[in-house]
Amino acid sequence: MKKKVRTMCHDCHTKCGVVLTVEDGVITGVEGDPNHPISEGMLCTKAFSAKEIHEHPDRLQYPMRRIGARGEGKWERFTWEEALDTIADKMKEVIEQYGPQSVVTAQGTGRACNAWHYRLQSSIGVPGFALAPTHVCLLPNLSQTHVTWGRMFHPHEACDYRRAKSIVSWGSNPIRSRQHSGLRILDSMRDGGKLIVVDPVFRDIASKAEVFLQIRPGTDSALALCLSNLIIQNKEYGAELLTTWSNAPFLVHPEEGRLLRETDINLDADPDADHYVVWNSNTDAPAYWLPEVKSYNIDDVGPVLDGKFTITTVSGTNIECVTAFREYANYLEQFTPEYASEITWIPADRIVAAYEVMISNKPCILSPYLGACMMSSNAVQSGRSITILQILLNPPVDEPGGILFNPIWDVTFDPIITMADQVPGQHLRLGYDKYPMYTQVYASSNWPASIWDAIETEEPWPIKVLACIATDLLGCYEHPQKIHEVLQSNNLELFVVMDYWMTPSAKLADIILPAAHWSERCMGDEEVIPDPCIVTIPQIAVDPPGEAKDDWYFWREMGKRIKPEWWPWDSTEEMYLARLKWFYDWPEDAGWDEAVEKAYIQPTNAGATRIFKQHEKGLIEFKTASRKIEIYSEAMPVYGYDAPFPTYAEPAEGPLTTPELYQEYPFILTTGARDYPFYHSAWTNIARQRVIEPWPYVEMNDEDAARLQISDGEWVYVQSPRGQIKVKARVSKATLKGVISLPRQNYKDDCKELNLPGYDWDQANPNILIPTDGSDPGFGCTPMRGTLARISKAE
């Protein structure tokens, strides 16, 4: 029997719509779904590998438990019920003896399981994600938008590309990493839109750029601050947006490094109220902004955006106060194109050229991604500097061609599904004091490196159970040498892995569980692109091999065993329908068949039907302390940063911060660039993918290669103070001189069909070279993009 099955690829975050042809239980065809509102029929090679992945002989098929020493490779099969009972019993034992914080569940990129993982952690007794790589992926940017806008959204996915007149693709190559974004950028260009690309390596989309800015990794905030300075110096900013919807007009206390309050200047002020002070041009006197009612204390206030005023305090002394806008502008004055050029290695005239394109072609939107604001020593402040640059550009907020607010994060982290409001315990996150922003924003987890330390030392508390779903710890995190050691520690009493394959981490597990591929399951999450914001209802196309189960099955069955009253569902379909009813006004009597027929559904609880300028219509609000967009954020110093506005800091390792180390390791290393055929560490064992990029490699500049007598295709060592890997040199003019770039994949798996070797977790893994120390002060981001290394011929 032949049938067409509409589903969704999960091989990367793009999550394209797919139509699979299935004949007698066998996948015989793969095509893009032309009716999918986001991918519009587009697919890449990963989706076309569905049949190969589904039928791959190396797939895990049955639950197994270890019968020899960890890593010895001796296993015996047992049932799912036995496996789940064993895990749950151990979790309950540990919770009773040590507390819920000693049980850690882990996930990878969370393409379909964020909310349910969160709910299980709440069931265990500690809210948030116990372990996820969010310290370098997505959350640094989401968190800075939360601080700035009072709304959590990802600027890269919040861009109305097709209606923009100019686009800055910043630390991103969407042709490879977010094809739907790349498609929309190209559509804008066909309509006359201009493209600027910021990247240390000239890749795909850079060939279409009006201006290409080849930047030193880790210095993105210096570029953003320079562009902001040019906008302010030339008065190209949007004064109305800044004056009406941001806290830029608020006055700054000159001695205390905070915003002035009514209590500072009015003896009759309510001491418990946080009322901010502006200078009212209509009365030539102070006025007060009241966030609790989102209005001023009097009618007809004309806040002055840029100025300096003498204010008399309650003590009778006079202080000179500038507006928050002027405070930031004063800091920016040092960031001339020439100064930014010295820092970023971008010629000053190229910076000016980019500025002129942005100003001359509005609306201009900025599309920053991992390289710009998530994987560096200054990640959060880089994100803030780019976000405020976007605000200054004034296209902008919830308008055609600008930034669009997306309800996905409101849905994903709503307490209805996460149960986070039912569980206290932020202080039970490792790293709570060291990296307050990371561990205290919602959706956060333990700071990852602290988990490895806690397993080893059992301080400040022991970690006794570690369950990893869809993540390979040895391929995912920095300095895996340490992780490999602690996973073999007797202090860790139970280590569980659920995956497609016998990964390097799975080889060290006590229990391994087989995971279902997207062609074999019907789970999914909301799409992150905002226009349209949808959830796709995927169908099961084929039966999984053996007894493989979907991830939601694990979360559900563990939840039933630990806190059954929070887990009333008996199937993945029932869980999906519950979400539709919570967030999508799905009829109570409508079942799974009706959902499948509907195919694509928009959320209703957050204004998903595109209504522009929602903030002006009162449909959404900025949930900051001031109920304004916060250019000046008093939360930032609380979280460990040096200023309430964005500042530049040199990378933790580099020619200026560690000059002696730079002499020994004279290249700036950036890691993690996407490749067409792979996603993170996945798919190097799939022939259709591996044939495109058969060998691990490093990109380097041809002049650097000539100086070191390294030829294109030659095996080389890449070394950092942390370790060494062996890869092939890819020599060209594409890479900035003095920079070397390693892609994300670690080539851990062999490809038997092509007779190509695998390199396990420690031979070609870029993370071997990356420090575990969190160099971003409040968030603990590590410098995956912008640390030091050297390169030499391999023996």
Task: Describe every region a protein language model picked out.
Residues 1-240, 244-309, 320-321, 338-339, ...:
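N-terminal export/assembly segments and adjacent metallocofactor-ligating motifs
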Residues 66-82, 229, 235-348, 430, ...:
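N-terminal leader/propeptide and maturation segments of large enzyme subunits in energy/redox metabolism
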Residues 84-101, 157-165, 331, 352-366, ...:
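Glycine-rich phosphate/diphosphate-binding loops that line cofactor/substrate pockets in enzymes
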Residues 98-102, 238-242, 365, 397-404, ...:
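Flexible, glycine/charged-enriched surface loops at secondary-structure junctions
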Residues 104-111, 339-347, 369-377, 408-411, ...:
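Conserved short loop/turn motifs at secondary-structure junctions
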Residues 117-186, 191-196, 222, 292-297, ...:
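Extended redox/cofactor-interaction regions of prokaryotic respiratory oxidoreductases
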Residues 158, 519-544, 554-555, 559-561, ...:
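Glycine/threonine-rich phosphate-binding loop and adjacent beta-strand/alpha-helix elements that clamp
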Residues 376, 551-595, 686-699, 703-795:
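Long, contiguous, secondary-structure-rich segments that constitute the structural scaffold
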